[in-house]
Design a protein with these regions (language model features):
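Beta-strand elements of well-folded, non-transmembrane domains
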Residues: 9-11, 35, 76-80
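Well-ordered alpha/beta subsegment
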Residues: 63-96, 103-111
Length: 141
């Protein structure tokens, strides 16, 4: 089962997917959006993602093989004793986190795919939200 989302976040339309894997007790949450043609710039995007991922705690970026575009993802582990409300709250919180992280990094993806900027130039465009925690693109806790 998958639930699709579409959110307007900081002026950017970000799509999302919530996929439940009941057999293994996890929910995969991803956020993605249109950031140009990633196929033509795959090496630079991989390098950018390689620089960003080590700074993150709860989420990670990848080039999604199905979507063929950058995506931010996280996994919610479902405790058997958790209530449905607790699981729903964790999933919604995680969707917010992956969406915020994707929106923060989207300008860097666009700098590479649309403006042919270098990886270092693109990295300087990552927008860290004011007062963000480390799980939101390396901010302070």
């Amino acid at each position: 089962m998958a639930i699709g989302t579409s959110l307007l976040y900081d002026g950017l339309v970000v799509g999302g997917s919530i996929q439940v894997f009941e057999d293994i007790g996890t929910v995969r949450v991803i956020a993605f959006g249109g950031v140009g043609n990633p196929g033509a710039c795959r090496a630079q995007l991989d390098e950018l993602i390689g620089l960003i991922n080590p700074t993150l705690l709860d989420v990670s970026f990848e080039i999604d093989l199905v979507l063929q575009m950058p995506a931010c993802r996280a996994v919610v582990r479902v405790d058997e004793s958790a209530t449905q409300e607790d699981v729903a709250a964790d999933v919604i919180r995680t969707l917010g986190s992956v969406t915020a992280n994707f929106a923060a990094v989207a300008p860097a993806f666009l700098a590479i795919t649309a403006d042919n900027k270098s990886v270092n130039e693109a990295l300087s465009l990552v927008r860290i939200p004011e007062g963000a925690k480390k799980s939101l693109i390396g901010g302070e806790s």
